[in-house]
C-alpha cells in the first residue's frame, strides 16, 4: 500500500528522532544551554542545577506521559475497533480530571508526595469509572459509533459542569493550581514526580505491549476471537484496566493533555499498518516525540513565559479530528 514503510524502519526512525528531540529540548528554553557550556561549567553552577533538576526531569516526564497517552489511545481504539475512540473525546480524561479536582479543592492540604499519590489514585478511579460506563454503553449500543461519541460528549459535558462547580467554590490558590493543571502542563516536573509516574506508566505500557495478540484477534469480532481461544470478557476488562491506569497516571502528573491518544495511533497506523505488535511500540515512541515537541514549543514560543502544553496539542488535534471525520465520511460515500 502506498505510504507504508517497514515497521522496523519506522520504529528505528522514531527512536532516533526521540533521542534528537530529547537532547535538543533539554538545551532549549528561556535560558539556552549548550553541552559545550555545561562541559566548561562547574557542576555547582546554577546552569547545571537548571539542566539537571529542571530541564532533564521535564524532558523525561514528557517522554513518559507521551507514551502513556498514545498507548492508552491505541488500546482504546483497538478495544472499540474504531480510530475515533480517544480517551479525551470519550470523557475518560474528564472523569480523571474531575476526581483530581475534588482532591485539589479539599479543605485540608497534604504533603507534596502524598498529594501526588492521591492525585494518581483519584485520576485512576475517575478514568476507570468513565471507561466502564463507556464500555457498557458501547455494548448496549452494539458498538454504534454515533451513540458512543454522543455518550462521550454527554459525559464530557457533565464532568465539565462539575469541574465548573469546583472552580466556583475554590479559593484563589486552588483556582490557580486547578486552572493551570486543567490546561495541561509539565511545569511541575521533578525527579520525585518522574519516579512515581514512571513506576506506574512504564510497567503498564509493557503489559499493554504484551496484549498485542489479543488486540489483533479482537479486531476480527468477539465471536471470532472467542473461537480462536481468547477469553473476550477477561481480555476487554484487562485492556480497560490498563488504559485507565495509563490515563490516570498521565492526568495526575500533567493535567489534561488532549488528542495525543487520537492523532498518534492513527498516524502510525497509516504508516505501518494495524498489527498491534508494531502499532503499540510505534505509538509509544510517536506519542513521546509529539508531546516532547509540543512541550518544547510551549517553553520557547513565549519565553520567558510559558504556554500550557494542552493548548498546543488541542490546536493540532482539533483540526486533525475534523479531517478524520470528513475522511471517514468520504470513504463511506465512496
Curated annotation (Swiss-Prot):
It is found in: Cell inner membrane. GO terms for molecular function: transmembrane transporter activity. The keyword Membrane applies. It is a multi-pass membrane protein. GO terms for cellular component: plasma membrane. Keywords: Cell inner membrane, Cell membrane, Ion transport, Iron, Iron transport, Membrane, Transmembrane, Transmembrane helix, Transport. Coiled coil: none annotated. The keyword Ion transport applies. The chain crosses the membrane at residues 9-29, 60-80, 96-116, 117-137, 149-169, 191-211, 244-264, 278-298, 306-326. GO terms for biological process: siderophore-dependent iron import into cell. PANTHER family: ABC TRANSPORTER PERMEASE PROTEIN MJ0876-RELATED (PTHR30472:SF25), FERRIC ENTEROBACTIN TRANSPORT SYSTEM PERMEASE PROTEIN (PTHR30472). Part of the binding-protein-dependent transport system for hemin; probably responsible for the translocation of the substrate across the membrane. Belongs to the binding-protein-dependent transport system permease family. FecCD subfamily. This is Hemin transport system permease protein HmuU. It comes from Yersinia pestis. The lineage of its organism: Bacteria, Pseudomonadati, Pseudomonadota, Gammaproteobacteria, Enterobacterales. The gene is hmuU.
